[in-house]
Structures are given as C-alpha cells and as structure tokens.
C-alpha cells in the first residue's frame, strides 16, 4: 500500500509518499524559517497561511518524483497533533479532502510517534525493544518502546524542553532565529570550560529533566556582562554558547544512559530536532561504548518535522494492524495538546 503523508504541525510543510513494502518513495519539505526570522519566533497565523500556499505544490512534487498518480495512493495520513491548532488544521483538511475525493481511509498520526519511529527509516534499522530519547523544541522525553503503539514513559521535562533551552538561551545571547542551530554553530568557536553552568537534575536519580534553571543561569551571565553599559563580546558569546550546549548535552546523555541501565536495554534511538546536534551525537557515541550499546539516529534531513515520518508511522501502524482502513465519514478533529500515552495499542 502507498500512503501519502502530510505534516503541518508548526513551521514546516512536509509531504511524503511511503510504501508499506518498499519504504520511503519521495518526500518534499518547505521550511518557514526565513518568514519568521524578523519576528524572532513562529507566528501561528503566518504559519497557517504559508501551509495553505505550499501543501498542494509539494504534493504534486512528491507524486512526480515517486512516479505516482493519485490513483496509486491507498491511504492518506496527517499529523493530528500536538502542535499549533491552525497549522494542524491545514494538513488535516487537505488530507481529509483528498481521502474523501478518492474514497480512501485517512489516518491521523501523533506527531511524536512520527519522530519516535523516524530512525527506523535509516539502515541499520533498530530492533524493538529500545529506549527512545525524544528531544525537540517542545518536548523532551525518555520512552521505552516495545513495538509500534507500545510506549512507556520513563521520564520527561518538568519545565522547558531541551530545544526550548537552546532557543531561549540563544535569544538571551542575541543570536538569530532559529536559535538552537545558531547557538550550536557559534559553540564550535567557543571554550565551554570558561563558564561554569549548572546541570539541572543531573544527579537526581530519576529520568526527568529540568532546563529552566540553566536558562536562568545564562541570563545571569548575560546581565553580568552587560551591566553598566558593557556588552557581551564575540568570544564571550561563543564561550557561553559552548558552555550552554555542553550542559544540555551532558544532561541528555546522562539521563539516556541511566534509562538504558534501568531497563537493561542496549539500543538507544534519538529523535527530534535536537537529535541533529553534532555534539550530542558524538557524546552519546563515546558514552555508549562501555555499555556495549548502540545509538540510532534518523538521517539529518529527517530530524526536523517532515512528512516522511508521518507517512512512515502510518505505514508501520498499517503493518501492525493498528490503523483503521475503513473509509469513514471524514469528520475529524486535531489535538493541539495530546499525550503520547493516549495512542497505546490495546
């Protein structure tokens, strides 16, 4: 079966075609970074309008690249949540309209399940069970994954997500949008040892996270440097960026390793936008060697939000017998807030 997937939960418009037997056939992505840069963050109304402009051309592009027509499509999938309500409605509406016009089933997918399963698109493909570290701008969670739809929450952030800590710290330093990638680039030129920043909950003994204290520490350093008309120099900024990144990565890696030890598992899957961070990948590669454990990441092109992960998650649900393939009445809802535990397989 060929599934056409749509992602529009925030500021990326993604469309992809996935075959349940052959895997990813084609995907296309448009990012709205340039549009939101002047505002320093995502403007929901602008995001929704841009999704409307982009989704149909991207769909045509994917079908052409895959050598398909709509007659070849057996089902459509879309991000049903969580995310920005207006943005979610664009992708859901297009998917449901297409499904109605072709008498196809429409499959609503949890955005985080898309991220969670995206490393399975790469080779070598991790086998179940594994521990998953989901790290993005809005979420930081550790999950035990025993199969498609079989997820156990091990720990999560109690306040800011890791990606949010990157972005907010970058904003405090006066870096551009998107802040996380700007901070990571600047950190390459910095000396992380120059600033002693906290590692919140590093030794808490549990698998939860907290990054608000780190953000406050960064703010304190910035205020100290700019007091009495002073300024944060370029090298100061680079050093602070390096220290901030090092603190976040150390906490993420330590908690992930603790999760592996507590579960007795030896496979770690890392997904979400922060999963593209080079320091995190390198740190985990070193830290996992003594455990004889393996880390699995999605391709860099699929770390950000994308349609491929949505179509692929739908395909995995179809193969696991967890998708309703009956043609419905195409009434639908989106869920801006949606707990991953709500989609557990019975």
Curated annotation (Swiss-Prot):
Entry-linked SUPFAM superfamilies: Actin-like ATPase domain (SSF53067)
One BP term from GO: tRNA threonylcarbamoyladenosine modification
GO cellular component: cytoplasm
Keywords, sorted A to Z: Acyltransferase, Cytoplasm, Iron, Metal-binding, Transferase, tRNA processing
E.C. code: 2.3.1.234
MF (Gene Ontology): iron ion binding; N(6)-L-threonylcarbamoyladenine synthase activity
InterPro entries in the cross-refs: ATPase_NBD (IPR043129), Gcp-like_dom (IPR000905), KAE1/TsaD (IPR017861), TsaD (IPR022450)
Catalytic activity: L-threonylcarbamoyladenylate + adenosine(37) in tRNA = N(6)-L-threonylcarbamoyladenosine(37) in tRNA + AMP + H(+)
Cofactor: Fe(2+)
Protein family (similarity comment): Belongs to the KAE1 / TsaD family.
Annotated protein name in UniProt: tRNA N6-adenosine threonylcarbamoyltransferase
Organism the protein comes from: Bordetella parapertussis (strain 12822 / ATCC BAA-587 / NCTC 13253)
Lineage: Bacteria, Pseudomonadati, Pseudomonadota, Betaproteobacteria, Burkholderiales
């Amino acid at each position: 079966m060929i599934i056409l997937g749509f992602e529009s939960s925030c500021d990326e418009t993604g469309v992809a075609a996935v075959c349940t037997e052959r895997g990813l056939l084609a995907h296309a992505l448009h990012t709205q970074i340039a549009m939101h840069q002047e505002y320093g963050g995502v403007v929901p109304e602008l995001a929704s309008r841009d999704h409307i402009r982009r989704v149909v051309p991207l769909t045509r592009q994917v079908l052409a690249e895959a050598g398909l027509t709509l007659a070849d499509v057996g089902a459509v999938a879309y991000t049903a949540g969580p995310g920005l309500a207006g943005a979610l409605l664009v992708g859901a509406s297009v998917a449901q309209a297409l499904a109605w016009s072709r008498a196809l089933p429409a499959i609503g997918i949890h955005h985080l399940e898309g991220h969670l399963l995206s490393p399975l698109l790469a080779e070598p493909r991790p086998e179940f069970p594994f521990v998953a570290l989901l790290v993005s701008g809005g979420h930081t969670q550790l999950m035990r994954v025993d199969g498609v739809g079989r997820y156990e929450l091990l720990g999560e952030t109690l306040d800011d997500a890791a990606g949010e800590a990157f972005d907010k710290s970058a904003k405090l330093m006066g870096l551009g949008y998107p802040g996380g990638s700007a901070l990571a680039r600047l950190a390459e030129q910095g000396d992380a040892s120059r600033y002693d920043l906290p590692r919140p909950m590093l030794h808490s003994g549990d698998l939860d996270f907290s990054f608000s204290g780190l953000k406050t520490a960064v703010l304190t350093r910035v205020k100290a440097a700019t007091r009495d008309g002073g300024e944060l120099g370029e090298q100061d900024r680079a050093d602070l960026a390096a220290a901030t990144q090092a603190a976040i990565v150390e906490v993420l890696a330590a908690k992930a390793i603790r999760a592996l030890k507590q579960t007795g598992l030896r496979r770690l899957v890392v997904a979400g936008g922060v999963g593209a961070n080079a320091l995190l990948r390198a740190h985990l590669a070193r830290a996992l060697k003594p455990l004889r454990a393996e880390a699995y990441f999605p391709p860099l092109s699929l770390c950000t939000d994308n349609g491929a992960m949505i179509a692929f998650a739908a395909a995995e649900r179809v193969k696991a017998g967890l998708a309703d393939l009956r043609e419905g009445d195409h009434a639908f809802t989106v869920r801006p807030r949606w707990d991953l535990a709500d989609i557990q397989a019975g």
